[in-house]
From Swiss-Prot:
Cofactor(s) required, per the database record: Mg(2+)
Keyword match tRNA processing: no
PROSITE patterns attached to this UniProt entry: PHOSPHOFRUCTOKINASE (PS00433)
Taxon lineage: Bacteria, Pseudomonadati, Pseudomonadota, Gammaproteobacteria, Enterobacterales
Species in which this protein is naturally found: Buchnera aphidicola subsp. Cinara cedri (strain Cc)
Record's protein name: ATP-dependent 6-phosphofructokinase
GO cellular component, one term: 6-phosphofructokinase complex
Leading EC class: transferase
């Protein structure tokens, strides 16, 4: 019988993490399960930095961005000796299970802990939408709205100055956020990790667009592919058109979660407690075809990688 659980947020924060925390805490307390909030991710687990969470701590979290528990990237957690110290703290606090909110890196840590005897449930919280075993992650749709709003504003000024704009979008090594934002924002050119980047080919496409009479355009590109400022200089030199690069950066992680993320966070938090009550462990939660599902974390990490939406990219190219 589960009497006490711990909850933490790990890695890059995303809008809706607080909504997950609220859902987990309220559902757990309704089943007479105590909840320990673990601060600053796995670093807090290592440092034994925990606090009992009550209704009053989470009552107003549904619409708040960020995470009240704090987050961090604690690379030392990859070391077994570090995890053993964290596990000692878990046993000292008499925690029966951990709920871990984050991305694939957080899932890997959850899998390690499960294999070392600490039952874990993973909930996907990241704007990158790159987590195994789910169509969407909590925070993705809020970030999408943020990026599309930025693209719309760039479109206004690019049109005024007959300028080429390059906008760098987060996503790590997944192009989902860039692709969806580019389609919704009407970007003429899309550069994502799933397609081999060829600078000369991109230039050729831009030159064709100029010959068609297009006086301005926007290039949407996922981070880590190239230096966008250098790319802007290259395009300007070759096309003789003013070209500017904009790096959106961490603004994409902030803001109040949109309705879909709030709903998804609430559903996943409830489902996590239901899984624990049924005796499940070593699971990750996802949403597939709008149905909340769960998978073995180890299986999901190895066999359920995100599928690239190539058909979506190919279809949108027909517009331009």
């Amino acid at each position: 019988m589960i009497k006490k659980i711990g909850i933490l947020t790990s890695g890059g924060d995303s809008p809706g993490m607080n909504a997950i925390i609220r859902s987990v805490v309220c559902t757990a307390l309704n089943h007479n399960i105590e909840v320990k909030g673990i601060y600053n991710g796995f670093l807090g687990l290592y440092n034994n930095d925990m606090k009992l969470l009550k209704y009053s701590h989470v009552a107003n979290l549904l619409n708040q961005g960020g995470t009240i528990l704090g987050s961090s990237r604690f690379l030392e957690f990859k070391l077994e000796k570090t995890r053993k110290i964290a596990i000692k703290n878990i046993y000292k606090r008499k925690i029966d299970c951990l709920i871990i909110i984050g991305g694939d890196g957080s899932y890997k840590a959850a899998n390690f802990l499960t294999n070392m005897g600490v039952p874990c449930i993973g909930i996907p919280g990241t704007i990158d939408n790159d987590v195994s075993g789910t169509d969407y992650t909590v925070g993705y749709f809020t970030a999408l709205e943020t990026v599309v709003d930025a693209i719309d504003k760039l479109r206004d000024t690019s049109a005024s100055h007959h300028r080429i704009s390059i906008i760098e979008i987060m996503g790590r090594y997944c192009g989902d956020l860039t692709l969806s934002a580019a389609i919704a924002g009407g970007c003429e050119f899309i550069v994502i990790p799933e397609i081999i980047y060829q600078k000369e080919l991109l230039l050729l496409e831009i030159q064709k667009s100029i010959k068609k009479g297009n006086k301005h355009s926007i290039v949407a590109i996922t981070e880590h592919i190239c230096d966008v400022n250098k790319l802007a200089k290259y395009i300007q030199k070759k096309t003789f058109k003013e070209t500017r690069a904009t790096i959106l950066g961490h603004i994409q992680r902030g803001g109040k979660p949109v309705a879909y993320d709030r709903i998804l966070a609430s559903r996943m938090g409830i489902y996590a407690i239901q899984l624990l009550l049924k005796g499940y462990k070593g699971q990750c939660i996802g949403v597939i075809n709008n149905k909340i599902v769960h998978h073995n974390i180890n299986y999901a990490l190895k066999n359920m990688k995100k599928i690239f939406k190539k058909d979506l990219l190919n279809s949108i190219k027909k517009i331009y």
